[in-house]
């Protein structure tokens, strides 16, 4: 019975960081959809990048950042498309 309790505790310790990782990825997807809907996030110009690392002993490191890649090019191509 004692070994069974240890097994359950191990599953909880491992499961919590994985659950947090899943929630963060879900939030990232929701943010991308919302930003696309209001016209801020353009797939060719801004990328939302999430770096999630699970470190031993259940420490979770999360880095959420935006990468802007040549926004002037995408803005000018959108501007040119509106006149064609």
Curated annotation (Swiss-Prot):
Transmembrane segments: 7-27, 52-72
Keywords: Membrane, Transmembrane, Transmembrane helix
Membrane topology: Multi-pass membrane protein
Compartments reported by the entry: Membrane
Recorded GO CC terms: membrane
Recorded superkingdom: Eukaryota
Name of this chain's protein: Putative uncharacterized protein YCR018C-A
UniProt organism field: Saccharomyces cerevisiae (strain ATCC 204508 / S288c)
High-level lineage: Eukaryota, Fungi, Dikarya, Ascomycota, Saccharomycotina
């Amino acid at each position: 019975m004692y070994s069974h309790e240890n097994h359950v505790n191990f599953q909880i310790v491992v499961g919590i960081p994985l659950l947090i990782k899943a929630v963060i990825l879900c939030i990232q997807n929701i943010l991308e959809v919302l930003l696309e809907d209001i016209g801020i996030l353009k797939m060719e110009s801004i990328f939302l990048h999430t770096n999630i690392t699970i470190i031993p002993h259940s420490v979770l490191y999360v880095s959420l950042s935006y990468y802007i890649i040549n926004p002037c090019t995408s803005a000018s191509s959108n501007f040119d498309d509106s006149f064609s």
